[in-house]
């Protein structure tokens, strides 16, 4: 697998597609590893399209949609205390401004490979992803190392604090609590390059994707600061959890020397 942040939801898109396509239309539940809550995806029973091509495409769209929701939950879980490595807080990364845009791009890249027939098996998928990433970065007008460092210097004190060190949460000062899968990148003040809009479909061939499967977050014994739900958290609850995080960060975020 490849290391950039957008490849994690890309890999999840491929993984979910490989499970969804053979079972499309069946009722079943996929259980994933815990992230504070126990992560489950419940797939509803429905009559899938009669066309092989439409079944394939619907499976791919549903996989990309769910992979992005997994990425959204990861941001929420990080803020509420999830740690993939014991003793190392991940709060610094929660809702950082580039995360969900990059995650959405990863889901889109994987979706493109699947729809183009460039992910027939895991090896084929990995090879195809290696090829598509450079062209995607070119389209996004990725900048060379020196220009990137100059921007880091310009936004020091606005987006991040060079006086802090990992894992201090407020090394990152700028966060984006907007969760939707219709996104522009968050741009620094003064950036004039037109942003690239990314989105995922909500409907395909008359099927509302959100009605085909439900992402469920069930309580565990290790919820850290995550409130315990009455039954389980679902996608409809994500915005409230993110808004609570935003309000607390707004109160506790240190004042900076620029644009405060």
Can you say where each PLM-predicted feature lies in the sequence?
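Bulky hydrophobic segments
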Residues: 1-92, 111-260
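Long, domain-scale functional regions
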Residues: 90, 102-103
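Hydrophobic/aromatic-rich structural module bridging two neighboring secondary-structure elements via a short loop
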Residues: 95-96
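Divalent metal-coordination and catalytic microenvironments
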Residues: 75, 99, 105
């Amino acid at each position: 697998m490849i290391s950039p942040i957008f490849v994690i939801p890309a890999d999840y898109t491929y993984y979910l597609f490989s499970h969804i396509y053979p079972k499309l239309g069946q009722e079943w539940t996929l259980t994933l590893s815990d992230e504070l809550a126990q992560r489950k995806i419940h797939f509803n029973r429905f009559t899938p399209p009669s066309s092989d091509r439409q079944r394939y495409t619907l499976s791919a769209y549903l996989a990309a949609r769910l992979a992005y929701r997994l990425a959204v939950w990861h941001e929420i879980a990080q803020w509420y205390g999830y740690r993939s490595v014991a003793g190392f807080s991940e709060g610094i990364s929660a809702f950082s401004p580039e995360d969900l845009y990059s995650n959405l791009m990863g889901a889109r890249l994987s979706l493109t490979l699947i729809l183009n027939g460039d992910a027939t098996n895991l090896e084929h998928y990995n090879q195809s992803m290696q090829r598509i990433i450079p062209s995607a970065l070119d389209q996004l007008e990725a900048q060379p190392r020196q220009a990137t460092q100059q921007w880091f210097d310009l936004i020091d004190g606005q987006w991040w604090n060079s006086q802090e060190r990992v894992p201090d949460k407020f090394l990152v000062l700028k966060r984006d609590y907007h969760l939707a899968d219709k996104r522009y990148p968050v741009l620094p003040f003064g950036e004039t390059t037109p942003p690239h809009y990314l989105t995922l479909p909500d409907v395909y061939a008359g099927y509302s994707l959100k009605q085909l499967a439900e992402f469920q977050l069930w309580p565990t014994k290790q919820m850290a600061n995550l409130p315990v739900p009455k039954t389980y958290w679902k996608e409809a609850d994500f915005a409230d959890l993110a808004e609570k995080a935003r309000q607390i960060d707004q109160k506790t975020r240190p004042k900076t020397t620029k644009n405060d």
